[in-house]
Every structure is written in C-alpha cells, then in structure tokens.
Amino acid sequence: MNKLLTSLLLSVTLMSGAQAQKKENYYVKHVEFPQSATIEQKVDMAARLVPTPQQYAWQQMELTAFLHFGINTFTGREWGDGKEDPALFNPSELDAEQWVRTLKEAGFKMVLLTAKHHDGFCLWPTATTKHSVASSPWKNGQGDVVKELRAACDKYDMKFGVYLSPWDRNAECYGDSPRYNDFFIRQLTELLTNYGEVHEVWFDGANGEGPNGKKQVYDWDAFYQTIQRLQ
C-alpha cells in the first residue's frame, strides 16, 4: 500500500512539474528566436505565443468602425495637400449621435475618428494651427467634431479612439524634426487630455514631404510615452 501511495505521489509530482514546465514555455507579447534556431523550432515557438491581457481584450471587441471624415469629405480627394481652404468644411447636418447609434445597432464596439489626416486639418479647435474647424464656417468656428463624437460614444456606451496622422502637409515646421515632434506631441496631448478616456490611438507610417519639401524623423518613443503618461 505504501509503495502504491508513493508511486501515485511521484506520478502526480511529475505531472505537476511537466505542466509547470509546459506553462513556462508559453511566450507573452513577443518571442525572440535564438540565432541557432531551426525553422521547426521557430514554428514551434511562434505557435506558443499568446496575447497580453490588453491584446486579448482588444480582440474580444471584434468590430471597430474607422470613420474617415474630414476636409477631404468636401474636396473628394483621398489625400489632401494641406492647402485646403478651411471654409470648405461646412457640414449642414452632421449628427454624431446618428453615426454612433447606427454603428451600435450594427454590432460595433468602438468608433475611431480621423482627428487629423495627412492634410493637417484638425477636427477639433486645436491651439497648434489655424488649419482646423475653428477657422471654418461650421457652427461659426465654434464646432468640435471630436467632442461631439466623444459625447455620442458616452451616450451609447461605445469605446472611443482617435487617428492622428504624423505626416502633416500643412505644418510649416514639418521636416524640422525637434520642432515638429513637439508640435505633434502638443496635438496628441490635447486629444488625450480634453476628451476623457481614449481607448485607442492610431498612427501610420506615412512620411512624405511637408510644405517645405523636407521629410520628418518621427520620435515614436516620445509619442508612445505621451500616450502612456496621459492615458
């Protein structure tokens, strides 16, 4: 009987050890392949990569609506050149609640707005540039699309996110890397401090020339640190 109990305990111990060892072989967020790793080993390691709790929660949202709305809506262009007259932005029946309500009924869980695209036109009354809704005739320059969408998301219990283009074809300081990075961080700070909780921030890698013909070196680390500090 004692031998049987000893064998059972040994078996349980070995199984527990094997399970613990197996659990340790999972990788969270990222995995680094050793230089000597074979293709088979890389495939095996990649198959054991699991998301972080934050990444898993993002996947569970399933559907996000990306609202590509801005001054290009009124010029009919995909990418503006930053020379648009703000007077062109004058929506007569903008109804953010109708947008969000429709998306909610369709099963979406988050709404993400292009607060600024490559043309540099801002959908909120930013202090960083005159190329914004504050210079438009919409609501006599007192309108704020970001604010209206944020309020609609609160009303319908939808998560809210913003897209802010690093490439800015209107900003004179674009291409002067330190100055423009500071300019961009000030815009990002406005969005992350004046509109409550922002559940997602989108950038992209577009890096064309600015109005001065120069390209910008983006300070991605500073951008991400700003997000982490404010949200």
Could you describe each region identified by the protein language model?
Residues 1-23:
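Bacterial Sec-dependent N-terminal signal peptides
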